[in-house]
């Protein structure tokens, strides 16, 4: 009898320990998961303020002072020209309603109502249309009408959570539809930088309008999981497991998408639209190897441009002529 009671006590203790562990794990998941959702993909999060705490996790060559000077001088020059262009070219505010009901806003820059060539230019993570407006200027100079939207949860667009490209690829289809409704004969190029690049790559594997003729991606990442794993190591010196797993669970519930499913790498395997891959070999945010993996995985017509000594989305400032010549040559091939 006493032995039986002892077994019951032991079993009870085991159950208490197991339940306690479950409660601790659930609590940790909620706490850690919510922290990283708030930090990384909340509209008001601090994920855009990047501070690298683990330098060893960022394996890129340093950009020398002379190169940095060239990049900054070209950036300033391009921005000044782009601001002048945006004030002179005819433009109008436009908006669409996303599949989940939020309102997305952007600006069309009209070179000529009669022309069929259009480009949609997408900005990056925690950024704005101003960061990519010089790209629109170069396309306009080549005879394109230009659409530059605010990504969801950015600027004038609604939304509480950043889509990291996965939700944004559905938003992109709404913008494509807007142009096609205006001009059924439109020829549309998609250009994305950073998260915008991930967006156009993630869209490439879906069925897009026949009006979409080419995709240009600059500094895109292989998947949401991969970029967050890289940044967890660089920013917080934290391991992928279990941090990202906790993040994934809470992001699924709050932001309504799965960071593990959100893969540009898997999407480009299904792509049929021509893609030009561009990357700087000194990118310390999205490592160059991600570009190489994406390029190798793509099963469509493709080309690649790697700019030496360029950091994240800096290729167009490091070698401006090379950058745009490659883009417009790609269309004529």
In which residue ranges do the predicted regions lie?
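N-terminal membrane-anchoring alpha-helices
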Residues: 2-73
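Conserved alpha/beta-hydrolase
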Residues: 136-158
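Short alpha-helix in the alpha/beta-hydrolase fold that links the catalytic acid
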Residues: 264, 273, 287-296
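Catalytic histidine neighborhood in serine/cysteine hydrolases
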Residues: 295-313, 320
């Amino acid at each position: 009898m006493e032995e039986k009671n002892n077994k019951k006590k032991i079993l009870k203790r085991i159950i208490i320990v197991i339940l306690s562990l479950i409660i601790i794990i659930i609590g940790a998941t909620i706490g850690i998961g919510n922290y990283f959702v708030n930090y990384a993909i909340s509209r008001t999060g601090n994920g855009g303020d990047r501070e690298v705490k683990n330098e060893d996790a960022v394996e890129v060559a340093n950009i020398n002072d002379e190169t940095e000077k060239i990049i900054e001088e070209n950036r300033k020059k391009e921005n000044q020209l782009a601001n002048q262009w945006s004030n002179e070219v005819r433009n109008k505010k436009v908006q669409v309603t996303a599949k989940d009901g939020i309102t997305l806003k952007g600006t069309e820059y009209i070179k000529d109502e009669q022309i069929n060539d259009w480009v949609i230019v997408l900005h990056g993570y925690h950024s704005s249309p101003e960061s990519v407006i010089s790209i629109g200027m170069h396309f306009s100079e080549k005879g394109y009408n230009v659409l530059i939207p605010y990504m969801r949860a950015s600027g004038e667009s609604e939304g509480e959570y950043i889509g990291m490209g996965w939700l944004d690829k559905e938003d992109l289809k709404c913008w494509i539809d807007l142009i096609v409704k205006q001009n059924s004969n439109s020829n549309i190029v998609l250009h994305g930088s950073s998260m915008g690049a991930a967006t156009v790559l993630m869209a490439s594997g879906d069925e897009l309008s026949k009006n979409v003729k080419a995709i240009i991606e600059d500094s895109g990442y292989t998947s949401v999981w991969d970029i967050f794993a890289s940044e967890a190591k660089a920013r917080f010196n934290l391991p992928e497991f279990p941090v990202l797993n906790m993040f994934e669970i809470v992001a699924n519930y709050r932001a309504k998408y799965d960071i593990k499913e959100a893969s540009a790498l898997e999407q480009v395997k299904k792509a049929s639209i021509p893609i030009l891959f561009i990357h700087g070999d000194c990118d310390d945010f999205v490592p160059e190897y991600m570009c190489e993996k994406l390029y190798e995985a793509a099963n469509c017509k493709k080309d690649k441009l790697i700019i030496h000594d360029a950091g994240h989305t800096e290729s167009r400032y490091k070698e401006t002529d090379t950058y745009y010549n490659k883009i417009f040559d790609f269309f004529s091939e």
